[in-house]
């Protein structure tokens, strides 16, 4: 006879040995219980009966989400062992967690393995196989994600649409994709969010380490980014929310990447990029641009013709240092007519590459020539 799906509710078992309490007390007691799940279906079905959820060595069936949406306030989710996802072409996400005052963490040796190589074909989201996004941290408010080790996501790793979310000491390791066809493996994609703090992240990938498409009061500190497209804002424009405001990138490194620091806006769109700081960013092995700010993106690619519908103002670039490849451009600024204002640059020391002669409408306080 097949065994029942395991669900161990420790506090509930302890309570069974006692006299039955009043119904309201049973409900409160159950919600304080610790539950260990070893399969995705039971975890998704029984998630609200537990305030401490342990996910141990789960293999998620093909085409399904490990769904921890709408958790009880104050729930803690802990991953143990290896969590894996079986292969199927679909959009995902592979993992979804939402709720208020939630803590998401793992044991010291745990791995969330997206098995990305099964989907990787060098196309990313531009064609080929349909690839699922990995983790939706949507409506995960007043919460914390701490210490996760995420490996080999099919495409984008963590999509953030939340308020008051802290992400600390998370590793996203898609380095296998360098040789196995990983593409569009963004580390953190942030949209329609406020008060997001990311500290101590390590991202090895083939796209943006961080991409902020919309949101306010976002802080990224102590990050280590390699292999991808750098620390990015945008593309801004053409979405429901086209405002990026009060963003700080500080005390971080970007290595072996296409870009170091990047802001990009959509041609002929409208929006606002305001109060942006990049401070103490160390660069090495940058292949395309050390600093690139351009207002000419159309259908996902730069055109060389800027527009001024998205304003970029109150930008501080300070203490950005390091080296780029010999055929890379150290600084490239392409603004629309009058759309970039109130910029300051100081302590910029980027070496090894070329000085651009194609910059346009560079605002006072900034320069393409150090």
Curated annotation (Swiss-Prot):
Residues 1-19 form the signal peptide. GO terms for cellular component: extracellular region. It is found in: Secreted. The keyword Zinc-finger does not apply. PbH1 repeats lie at residues 162-192, 193-214, 215-235, 244-265, 273-295, 307-352. The keyword Membrane does not apply. It catalyses: (1,4-alpha-D-galacturonosyl)n+m + H2O = (1,4-alpha-D-galacturonosyl)n + (1,4-alpha-D-galacturonosyl)m. Disulfide bonds join 35-50, 209-225, 335-340, 359-368. Keywords: Cell wall biogenesis/degradation, Disulfide bond, Glycoprotein, Glycosidase, Hydrolase, Repeat, Secreted, Signal, Zymogen. Its EC number is 3.2.1.15. GO terms for molecular function: galacturan 1,4-alpha-galacturonidase activity; polygalacturonase activity. Glycans are attached at residue 246. Involved in maceration and soft-rotting of plant tissue. Hydrolyzes the 1,4-alpha glycosidic bonds of de-esterified pectate in the smooth region of the plant cell wall. This is Probable endopolygalacturonase A.
């Amino acid at each position: 006879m097949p065994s029942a799906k395991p669900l161990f509710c420790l506090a509930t078992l302890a309570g069974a040995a006692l006299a039955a309490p009043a119904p309201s007390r049973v409900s409160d007691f159950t919600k304080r219980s610790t539950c260990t799940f070893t399969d995705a279906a039971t975890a998704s079905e029984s998630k609200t009966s537990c305030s401490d959820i342990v996910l141990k060595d789960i293999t998620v069936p093909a085409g399904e989400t490990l769904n921890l949406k709408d958790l009880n306030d104050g729930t803690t989710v802990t991953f143990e062992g290896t969590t894996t996802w079986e292969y199927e072409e679909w959009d995902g996400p592979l993992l979804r967690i939402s709720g208020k005052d939630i803590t998401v963490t793992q044991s010291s040796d745990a791995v969330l393995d997206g098995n990305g190589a099964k989907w990787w074909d060098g196309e990313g989201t531009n064609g080929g196989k349909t690839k699922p996004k990995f983790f939706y941290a949507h409506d995960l408010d007043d919460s914390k994600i701490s210490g996760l080790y995420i490996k080999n996501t099919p495409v984008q790793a963590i999509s953030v649409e939340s308020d008051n979310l802290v992400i600390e000491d998370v590793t996203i390791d898609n380095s296998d994709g360098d040789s196995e066809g990983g593409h569009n493996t963004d580390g953190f994609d942030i949209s329609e969010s406020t008060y997001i703090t990311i500290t101590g992240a390590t991202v090895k990938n083939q796209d943006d380490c961080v991409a902020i498409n919309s949101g306010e009061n976002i802080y990224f500190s102590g990050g280590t980014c390699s292999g991808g497209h750098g620390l990015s804002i945008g593309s801004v424009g053409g979405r429901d929310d086209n405002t990026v405001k009060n963003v700080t990138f500080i005390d971080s490194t970007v290595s072996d990447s296409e870009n170091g620091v990047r802001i990009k806006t959509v041609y002929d769109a409208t929006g606002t990029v305001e109060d942006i700081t990049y401070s103490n960013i160390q660069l090495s092995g940058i292949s395309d641009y050390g600093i690139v700010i351009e207002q000419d993106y159309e259908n996902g690619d730069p055109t060389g013709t800027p527009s001024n519908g998205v304003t970029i103002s109150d930008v501080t670039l300070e203490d950005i240092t390091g080296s780029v490849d010999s055929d890379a451009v150290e600084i490239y600024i392409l603004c629309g007519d009058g759309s970039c204002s109130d910029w300051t640059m100081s302590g910029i020391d980027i070496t090894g590459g070329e000085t651009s002669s194609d910059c346009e409408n560079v605002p006072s306080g900034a320069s393409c020539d150090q």
